[in-house]
Amino acid sequence: MTANLLDFDLDGLAVFCERLGEKRYRAVQLFRWIHQKGASNFDDMSDLAKSLREKLKVSAQVKAPDLISQHISSDGTIKWLFDVGGGDAVEAVFIPEEDRGTLCISSQAGCAMGCRFCSTGHQGFSRNLKTGEIIAQLWFAEHFLRKHLQRDERVISNVVMMGMGEPLQNYAELVPALRAMLDDHGYGLSRRRVTVSTSGVVPMMDRLARDCPVALAVSLHAPNDLLRDDLVPLNKKYSLAELLNACNRYLAYAPRDFITFEYCMLEDVNDQPEHAQQLVRLVQHYSSGGVWCKFNLIPFNPFPASGLTRSTPERIQAFAKILSDAGIVTTIRKTRGDDIDAACGQLAGEVKDRTRVGERIARQRTFMLKPVSEINTQVKEN
């Protein structure tokens, strides 16, 4: 069976090379060719022995999902749609700024979380992405942008796992992809510049802290369990108390000294002054005295059939002021790419086979009921 080399972190690639009778340093060379130079043709890898190149031609490939479409926003944001087979497609979004280039990556086709304000959740869950399908989004985007912008140096400085899916429900495939992003022979990204966003899969937050502690963002969206049960159904499994305690445990390993809480601003749902005051009390209750979190307020990005409305700018500003006045670092996310449905909460994948939506929703319900022991959490040993 032909192996896709994008599925391996460096250690996995070293094991693969050993099976071919090659030394570890060959894996380093190969890893650099793939991730730093964007090579997919083994004949282009000129410092590899010809004998190794011939072995690779019959046993391996470097294969990213096919690109279906590209959309460029008026603000420079780029959205790519990738075909991952079986009628499924996933999206990645590049957000250019003066001091950074951020890529938003998907981890699943669809999502099992069912958050009310998220278009992906309304699509339902289809399947987990493989490691190669996750890292291929960065591999494609980085080398496409270098060629397009005629630059030799790195274009993407930050990666956020905030695209389609719940990353921590795909733990075994996620971690090797994160390691490839961080590896100096790969993309060499700082742990501070790679962020995993989670709805609050508490046991996997603890695992990530030990295995690959990158920056953490938590989709909070509500100041109490009653409201969060409605907006983020996973809260019925892991309450705010369990989630906030897990956040404090994560801080001991985190590359930053704070956790980011994401809070989608929904008119007349979670945007009242009393909600902000409840958040202040919640944060203070779990604080050990210092600043341990920041809030990122996200204006809701509407999509059909959501039944929700974006809070007014005035209400968002007033909400932010209550948090800031309490000493909580608070930012308001600038909406980017909403004219191409690339803004936060809008990624739905434009799945080619729309006839399977009912099947996906049923699979979503089943997936949500699984105990953690049945979720794919075993990091691959190659």
Curated annotation (Swiss-Prot):
InterPro entries: Aldolase_TIM (IPR013785), Methyltransferase_A (IPR040072), RlmN_N (IPR048641), RNA_MTrfase_RlmN (IPR027492), rRNA_lsu_MTrfase_RlmN/Cfr (IPR004383), rSAM (IPR007197). Keywords: 4Fe-4S, Cytoplasm, Disulfide bond, Iron, Iron-sulfur, Metal-binding, Methyltransferase, rRNA processing, S-adenosyl-L-methionine, Transferase, tRNA processing. Residues 97-339 form the Radical SAM core domain. Binds 1 [4Fe-4S] cluster. The cluster is coordinated with 3 cysteines and an exchangeable S-adenosyl-L-methionine. The keyword rRNA processing applies. One of its GO terms (cellular component) is cytoplasm. S-adenosyl-L-methionine binds at residues 165-166, 197, 219-221, 301. [4Fe-4S] cluster binds at residues 111, 115, 118. GO terms for molecular function: 4 iron, 4 sulfur cluster binding; metal ion binding; rRNA (adenine(2503)-C2-)-methyltransferase activity; rRNA binding; tRNA (adenine(37)-C2)-methyltransferase activity; tRNA binding. It catalyses: adenosine(2503) in 23S rRNA + 2 reduced [2Fe-2S]-[ferredoxin] + 2 S-adenosyl-L-methionine = 2-methyladenosine(2503) in 23S rRNA + 5'-deoxyadenosine + L-methionine + 2 oxidized [2Fe-2S]-[ferredoxin] + S-adenosyl-L-homocysteine; adenosine(37) in tRNA + 2 reduced [2Fe-2S]-[ferredoxin] + 2 S-adenosyl-L-methionine = 2-methyladenosine(37) in tRNA + 5'-deoxyadenosine + L-methionine + 2 oxidized [2Fe-2S]-[ferredoxin] + S-adenosyl-L-homocysteine. GO terms for biological process: rRNA base methylation; tRNA methylation. Specifically methylates position 2 of adenine 2503 in 23S rRNA and position 2 of adenine 37 in tRNAs. m2A2503 modification seems to play a crucial role in the proofreading step occurring at the peptidyl transferase center and thus would serve to optimize ribosomal fidelity. Reaction proceeds by a ping-pong mechanism involving intermediate methylation of a conserved cysteine residue. This is Dual-specificity RNA methyltransferase RlmN. It comes from Albidiferax ferrireducens (strain ATCC BAA-621 / DSM 15236 / T118).
